[in-house]
Amino acid sequence: MTGPISPDEFFSRLFSSKAARSGAVVRRQVRDVERYVGREHFLLELRRRGFPVIENAGQFIIFCNQEPIERVI
């Protein structure tokens, strides 16, 4: 992402992506989330949508569906 964007624009771009629309997985840099919308607002929106999210190595991994997550290893 380039330049400052509003929280509404951030979420619009995130949830209008092909992966998000098809119920797949998307990633966002933690620093971008914190810069554009704030961690708390981001997590509240994902919780509202029922989308699981995990954090690893400076990335948020968002499962754009409400299916259970099973760690296999």
Residue locations for each model-derived region?
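Short, surface-exposed ligand-recognition loops at beta-strand->loop->(often short) alpha-helix junctions
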Residues: 31-37
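Alpha-helical protein-protein interaction elements
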Residues: 2-3, 7, 34, 43, ...
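An N-terminal amphipathic alpha-helical segment
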Residues: 1-25
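Catalytic residues for metal-mediated phosphoryl-transfer on nucleic acids/nucleotides
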Residues: 26-30
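Residues that form generic nucleotide/phosphate-binding pockets
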Residues: 13-14, 36, 45
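Short, compact, well-ordered microdomains
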Residues: 40-72
